[in-house]
Amino acid sequence: MLPFFPEPSLSYTQQNRTAVLLLNLGTPDAPTAQAVRPYLKSFLTDRRVVELPKWLWYPILHGLVLTLRPKKSAHAYEKIWFKEGSPLEVYTARQAAALAKRMPDLIVRHAMTYGNPSVADVLSELKAQGAGRLLVIPMYPQYAASSSGAAVDKVCEQLLLQRNQMSVRTVSRFYDDTGYIDAMKNHILRYWAEHGRGKKLMLSFHGVPQKHHDLGDPYPDECRHTAKLLAEALELTEDQYVVSFQSQFGRAKWVTPSTQDLFGKLPKQGVTELDVFCPGFLADCLETMEEIALMGREQFYEAGGKSYRYIPCLNDNPDWIDALVALAEENLGGWR
């Protein structure tokens, strides 16, 4: 077996193109237990995601999680699946297509850290198209080792197999990027103008285990800074918004406050009109459409809430595409 992949037979000038890769988390190929299981296995065996010794984690993963969770997750995916496929895949593809239209001199593709289109397949395609320089934009404004770090790991794994390695730049974070903040502000204001506005805005970010933060992961701090900048842009007072963290998994302690806990507590504190937006998610997916838009609504109403609005993610919003173009241009530097 060859230690490196064969390289395409291209001249130097043919291998001098620049590519941009939008890299998101991933999704199963279908809303079925059979498709969800390998996706979850790929995700939950990543050392960046679960920082436990294999001897401890793998019996739990294979004996319980991969036995029970695929069917439950598949049912959740069924609720939000589009005719074109997974919402995360559909929206990320649209973002890449919009970026490609705005930057026609570049090769623009998207890939998933777990699932399809895979990083391995997309990088092979880029090499075949003559890409010698690659800008990787993990689609996570706030850096976390379990998301941004894992995404870059996948790219580096492929670099290890390239005989003629591409030059690579990565965008590790953009939690305070002006274009990103402005795009969210405009998006929320337009939503409020069309659908009305609740008494409080919840800014819900994906959670991480508290231990990750204790060991130096900056993610929770960057989330709170994003929330502060967005609240200032929206001219909100401190009592008009709340920051929370969702999607806890397992028994470990996670960063707080929990989004799910607040759904139960806020109505009892007199907050019966709630709007929810997820700044850390750039494309709607299972965690936003099912966990927040559907399940969150049920939890809030069961606790006594009267009005609940889920504000969709930026997705392919034109203001966000403008910000994405600017972000790419800034990080491409002399590569264009």
From Swiss-Prot:
GO molecular function term, any single one: ferrochelatase activity
Main location class: cytoplasm
SUPFAM superfamilies to which the protein is assigned, alphabetical: Chelatase
CDD domains (UniProt xref): Ferrochelatase_C, Ferrochelatase_N
Residue sites binding Fe cation per the record: H206, E287
Catalytic reaction annotation: heme b + 2 H(+) = protoporphyrin IX + Fe(2+)
Broadest EC class assigned to this enzyme: lyase
Domain of life: Bacteria
EC number in record: 4.98.1.1
Compartments (UniProt record): Cytoplasm
Keywords: Cytoplasm, Heme biosynthesis, Iron, Lyase, Metal-binding, Porphyrin biosynthesis
Pathway membership: Porphyrin-containing compound metabolism; protoheme biosynthesis; protoheme from protoporphyrin-IX: step 1/1
GO terms for cellular component: cytoplasm
Biological-process GO terms, alphabetical: heme biosynthetic process
Cited function: Catalyzes the ferrous insertion into protoporphyrin IX.
Family assignment from sequence similarity: Belongs to the ferrochelatase family.
Name of the protein: Ferrochelatase
